[in-house]
Amino acid sequence: MATSLSVSRFMSSSATVISVAKPLLSPTVSFTAPLSFTRSLAPNLSLKFRNRRTNSASATTRSFATTPVTASISVGDKLPDSTLSYLDPSTGDVKTVTVSSLTAGKKTILFAVPGAFTPTCSQKHVPGFVSKAGELRSKGIDVIACISVNDAFVMEAWRKDLGINDEVMLLSDGNGEFTGKLGVELDLRDKPVGLGVRSRRYAILADDGVVKVLNLEEGGAFTNSSAEDMLKAL
């Protein structure tokens, strides 16, 4: 059961009274601590020991709230080169494209999703860029590409399922090479769905391969990497 321990220092006394109380039928036990003990404590110190399950949840919340979302890449950096793949829809052949050739001399939006056919990616993230592709291009964007740690065959099947034509390129980072160079790996090996190591969700605006905007999500969250967010940044 939970136990509450409260320590308070009385300004008019040379000792501190410590009360230990259990929430059920156990009586309250009080004793007076020696002055040497109280001097080692900061004034108005309060310690509380709660049920471990509650503590764990609150600690997790604090961690998400205070831990900065970081990556190896940052605004002002040149995008690392890497080879991505896709299926040519007219021939079914596997084609490759390098990040450098995709971005050289162009304004490019690269956005990543944790996985093809996953709910948020299929229902919100990719369709948002498809629907806003015209607006983005009217503001000077030359290339819009979605990257995922899936193989090229899965990405092509996903493209067909979403009914995408040439609005957005769906590119495979099958081995996670580009994802690793950016430092945005998402380790999902402890999850039961078998996703393994994927990419965190992000959206990057690059001008001639140099990062101008980097909207990086915590894991697979979807809060600041949408097409609307990129339109606001232009």
Swiss-Prot record:
Keywords: Antioxidant, Chloroplast, Oxidoreductase, Peroxidase, Phosphoprotein, Plastid, Redox-active center, Transit peptide. GO terms for molecular function: thioredoxin peroxidase activity. Residues 73-234 form the Thioredoxin domain. Residues 1-70 form a transit peptide. The modification Phosphoserine is found at S82. The keyword Transit peptide applies. It is found in: Plastid, Chloroplast stroma. GO terms for cellular component: chloroplast; chloroplast envelope; chloroplast stroma; cytosol; plastid; thylakoid. Expressed in all tissues but predominantly in buds, siliques and seeds. It catalyses: [glutaredoxin]-dithiol + a hydroperoxide = [glutaredoxin]-disulfide + an alcohol + H2O. Signal peptide: none annotated. One of its GO terms (biological process) is cellular response to oxidative stress. It comes from the Eukaryota. The active site is at C121 (cysteine sulfenic acid (-soh) intermediate). Its EC number is 1.11.1.25. Its main location: plastid. Induction: Down-regulated by salt stress. PANTHER family: PEROXIREDOXIN, PEROXIREDOXIN-5, MITOCHONDRIAL. Thiol-specific peroxidase that catalyzes the reduction of hydrogen peroxide and organic hydroperoxides to water and alcohols, respectively. Plays a role in cell protection against oxidative stress by detoxifying peroxides. May be involved in chloroplast redox homeostasis. Monomer. Belongs to the peroxiredoxin family. Prx5 subfamily. The active site is a conserved redox-active cysteine residue, the peroxidatic cysteine (C(P)), which makes the nucleophilic attack on the peroxide substrate. The peroxide oxidizes the C(P)-SH to cysteine sulfenic acid (C(P)-SOH), which then reacts with another cysteine residue, the resolving cysteine (C(R)), to form a disulfide bridge. The disulfide is subsequently reduced by an appropriate electron donor to complete the catalytic cycle. In this 1-Cys peroxiredoxin, no C(R) is present and C(P) instead forms a disulfide with a cysteine from another protein or with a small thiol molecule. This is Peroxiredoxin-2E, chloroplastic. The gene is PRXIIE.
